[in-house]
Amino acid sequence: MDKLLIKGGRSLAGTVDISGAKNAALPELCAALLTADTVTLENVPRLQDVATMLKLIRNMGVEAERGTHAPGTVTLHAGALSSPEAPYELVKTMRASVLALGPLLARFGEATVSLPGGCAIGSRPVDQHIKGLQAMGAEIVVEHGYMIAKLPAGQKRLKGVSITTDMVTVTGTENFLMAASLAEGETILENAAQEPEIGDLADMLIKMGAKIEGHGTRRIRIQGVERLHGCTHQVVADRIETGTFLCAVAAAGGDVVLRHGRADHLDAVIDKLREAGATITAGEGFIRIQAQGRMKAQSFRTTEYPGFPTDMQAQFMALNAIAQGSSTVTETIFENRFMHVNEMVRLGAKIQIEGKAAVMEGVEKLSGATVMATDLRASASLVIAGLVAEGETLVDRIYHLDRGYDQMEAKLRGIGADIERVRA
């Protein structure tokens, strides 16, 4: 099992190229199921979750090829499927497999999708997906660990309806967007998620011929069409990777330009970093961060977009750990999302968990130790902590990191970090 060995204490300087967003690429790979034409995706990140999704749709019969000279380009052709099924063996490590449910139902009238795995950060139920697709006319049963869905006899398409979810659900909104694009009539999504990745998926679907209005707001209208065609689409830049590098520079100090970063997708995080003492400037296709000395600790509360993202909570906590002053971090989205805390404490952080909140007292220095990653964003937070800790930090179980970060250690090395992958 690979590990990362980090020698802390170096400031960071240079340029980092931000990759395409994992949370946009995964639904967009599934969107290729909606057409028999060729779909070309550009700026697709090289991640374990993306590799798993490609394996999944290939298993269904989709032709999917990465460009040899342009590895960020993936060409997809779902002319016919051999099997509209997402088996447990392929999806047990990745929750995003549920995104195949809507497209398969909409185009082929049937789908068998394993209940998803992939995250250790609390229950993320798929009941909202099932309720919404049932409202559109699908018959769905859950048995033996699978969601088995089909259209009723004699019904050729899903039906447009109004769907109001009990809570804001990102993957639910994406599933309904894709399913409704080929449904009969109009679908209205109330309480829709507003994340930039959803807007990017909607932009791709519109290029394919979908009729969608209101994406980026809480109310999305989709007028179903009989067929969608192919398109070429560039995956939006990863705002969480961007935020992770911003926190790393704020913690370690330095002057770094993030190419392709979108400041307008990270307002809540950038506001907190500026309050902490970092100087951040942004323009078309770049963000620059300059940080010197200890930052000031910042309290925050995670909420749905455009609020502070839960996917940035752990990374900002790594910054707070060595910042001046005390802070309170409140997690409102997921349970079990403080699993990185025990590992940070091993490095010398002062953190107390009080229900849904973590109360932190910044320390002047952390000291290197062996720590274990527990989930994707927790692993990133431990890397940031390792960059500022005295001595050597060894981060174990970094397969979590590989699920969501494209060559993170190489990018950090490129801006001056002393970090290397240790092959087991």
Curated annotation (Swiss-Prot):
UDP-N-acetyl-alpha-D-glucosamine binds at residues 95, 124-128, 311, 333. The active site is at 119 (proton donor). GO terms for molecular function: UDP-N-acetylglucosamine 1-carboxyvinyltransferase activity. The modification 2-(S-cysteinyl)pyruvic acid O-phosphothioketal is found at residue 119. Keywords: Cell cycle, Cell division, Cell shape, Cell wall biogenesis/degradation, Cytoplasm, Peptidoglycan synthesis, Pyruvate, Transferase. Signal peptide: none annotated. The keyword Transferase applies. It catalyses: phosphoenolpyruvate + UDP-N-acetyl-alpha-D-glucosamine = UDP-N-acetyl-3-O-(1-carboxyvinyl)-alpha-D-glucosamine + phosphate. The keyword Cytoplasm applies. Cell wall formation. Adds enolpyruvyl to UDP-N-acetylglucosamine. This is UDP-N-acetylglucosamine 1-carboxyvinyltransferase. It comes from Polaromonas sp. (strain JS666 / ATCC BAA-500).
